[in-house]
């Protein structure tokens, strides 16, 4: 039976209204722009096709699903993440970032999602056994610019020579070649770099300073911060972090247990 003109107009109004509502919903929920430096496996890295992958990438996608928003990964230098957040270039930082009082002065942090700590990658040629051996004349310490290891060395190792380098790989190379006594970095990073350089380095995996990683948010964005914290609590309760460890951190978890070091999750 043919539709009347009135019925046709009614249907058109319905479809137009539905379309406009859909457009409005999309506009109200833009992609969640997540900043990270894709140079820290297995947390932040790229696959063989150049696409982001790793623990932090999976965590970001789970957060996006919880919020009902698509996720857009923004690859930025680590020391450029906070400036990008403050200027609105990204919505949050999820990049193995330690929550420190210094950083909390310029950005807000979520609840901690991972316990970490500063450790050492030591040259096989060096007599350094712990952080207590670093602050001595003649010692050379490699640190990555903008990290908590950089901050620690600046504040506590004035007698040593501190090499501030832009790349993690450059710090590791200095140690592996015997040009630096030690590289100060987090547990997972130290483990990964020792695993690739076992003949020329040795790890000190027991943290000499406890730290926690958290998600960075723009100051005053309390609504998003509350949603992120709710997600983290639910994700932990549902076993999400255990699943991430089983997917990405099997060898690390086993090695930590072997050495009697508490695991990060």
Question: For each of these PLM feature ranges, what is it?
Answer:
Residues 29-96, 105, 164:
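Extracytoplasmic small-molecule ligand-binding "clamshell" domains
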Residues 38, 114-122, 187-233, 251-265:
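Periplasmic-binding protein-like
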Residues 46-48, 60-68, 131-137, 149-166, ...:
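Ligand-binding cleft/hinge of the Venus flytrap
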Residues 70-77, 143, 160-168, 174:
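Short beta-strand-to-loop elements that line the ligand-binding cleft
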Residues 80-83, 95-106, 152-155, 176-209:
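A ligand-binding cleft/hinge motif common to bilobed small-molecule-binding domains
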Residues 122-140:
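Flexible hinge/capping segments at coil-to-helix
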Residues 148-165, 203, 233-265:
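Ligand-binding clefts/hinges and TM-proximal coupling segments of bilobed small-molecule sensing domains
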